[in-house]
Amino acid sequence: MPGAKSRFDDFIATHINQTMTIHWTGNFLTWHRYFTWLYEKALQDECGYQGSQPYWNWGLTAITGLETSALFDGSDTSMSGNGVPIPNQPDLILGINVGLPAIYLPSGTGGGCVTSGPFQNMSVNLGPASLELPGGINIQNPNGPFAYNPRCLKRDLTTAINRKFANASSILSNILGPQNINDFQTKMQGVGSDIGIHGGGHFSLGGDPGRDFFVSPGDPAFYLHHGMIDRVWWIWQQMDPQTRANGASAISGTRTFLNNPPSPNTSIEDTVDAGFAAGVPRKIKDLLSTTSGPFCYVYL
């Protein structure tokens, strides 16, 4: 991958390469659980990090607001802050570029380069592959998503999206409502104009690559977002672990995005391959529980 210049970029390249077979698929949750865990292991084993992978509790930032939260206030201990404000940004319009009904989302209070906190001088090297911009614009790198294309990290923090789609009530509804994995992950990924808690986190972060379906791991906050996705799934699993964290009843879906092109149903015997992130290929059945297979963790 010519544009990958670091181990961090290896993870982005992996996500770009597999995007259409890890979203709206039967392996969506297990793939991202393993991916986030591998990132944590790389930080610990290759970078000397002594902590654990934290999660972003969207329910809390929906109360405090994103820019005043400890996570995004731009302090030295944050995940950096907002981007430089771009005034009078129009709404985002999702779906129209792929022939789907339009979903209108408000723009945030930033939009430009991040100028505070640990990632203020960070370079995003890969993409864009499918970057949603205000006004219904979608852009791609004409040289392809894997070409070297260094640019600043941009954010457009949007508390309104956080409060509408990823608040405490929507989290609770996603845990208590669905009684099977198909309904659970469908609700999480969004139905119609409801973008779900998964989309709610991504689009409340905004920016480049935060609004890029393929390149979103290029913002380090991605891993905190997916830590919370994994936590919500884990809580739901604990309500019926025999059914929800074990066997064929724990997964649902096919091997391709919205089954396009048509593909076989995902099996617990299917393999999750982390590609450039360099993890050992694992069977889905070994990734269903956080206390078996390669994993040994629980959530608070």
Regions found by a protein language model. Name each.
Residues 1-300:
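C-terminal accessory segments of proteins
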